[in-house]
Design a protein with these regions (language model features):
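Short phosphate/oxyanion-binding micro-motifs
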Residues: 1-142, 150, 155-177
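Conserved small/polar residues in nucleotide/adenosyl-binding loops
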Residues: 200-207
Length: 207
């Protein structure tokens, strides 16, 4: 069994809908190829009754947060290799975020997986962090599709970031959160957006 003292890999992917069986199979194959300890998905577009359709060998433990319609939706998948003990799950009724608190070999871990709305993303995340602050601790990972760029290095166009995004950055700083990617790659201009399904080409903000 893997522990936090071992190498812990986490991947995140906006799947833009998983109701199509071919799409689910492609996502399943991608996850198996990446072989992460934890996988966070955004825009699953599941309703509660649809979640049974996501089955991936090796990742039997899946936590969903779904809205009432086929939009938004987030999920956290835990590898069978990980001895994970859940403690608390907080789900957004609109399917825009999920908080999972648990432990791996008695070491606490909190994951906040976010799919922010296309409009007003920075303000939404800022308000969300205040709303769920009591669940966050010094072993918290915040990830997902923020629908914004936190830095001008995170976007292909070099326009200045908005005042709402600057306010969000201030909140993250005040809460002592660190942008792991930007810390490890301070000057990188890589992007993680892909244009459609799982074969994508167009660069866009690193969300």
């Amino acid at each position: 069994m893997m522990t936090l003292n071992s190498y812990l890999s986490i991947v995140t992917l906006n799947v833009n809908g998983l109701n199509d069986p071919i799409k689910r199979r492609r996502v399943s194959d991608w996850i198996k190829k990446q072989d992460p300890s934890i996988c966070c998905l955004q825009e699953t577009h599941f309703r509660q009754k649809d979640t049974y359709s996501l089955k991936i060998k090796g990742w039997r433990t899946i936590y969903h947060s779904n809205g009432p319609q086929k939009k938004a939706g987030v999920a956290i998948l835990i590898s069978d290799k990980l001895k994970f003990t859940p403690k608390t799950v907080v789900r957004d009724e609109e399917g825009h975020y999920i908080i999972l608190k648990g432990s791996i070999q008695q070491e606490d871990l909190t994951i906040l997986n976010i799919y922010a709305p296309n409009v007003g993303a920075a303000k939404y995340i800022n308000q969300l962090l205040t709303k769920v602050k009591k669940y966050l601790d010094n072993n918290t990972l915040i990830l997902g599709d923020f629908n914004l760029a936190l830095s001008i290095l995170d976007r292909s166009s070099k326009h200045n970031i908005s005042k709402e995004t600057r306010a969000l950055n201030d909140t993250l700083d005040q809460m002592d959160f660190t942008d792991i990617y930007r810390t490890l790659h301070p000057n990188s201009t890589e992007y993680t957006f892909f244009s459609s399904c799982l074969l994508y080409t167009s660069p866009s903000p690193r969300d």
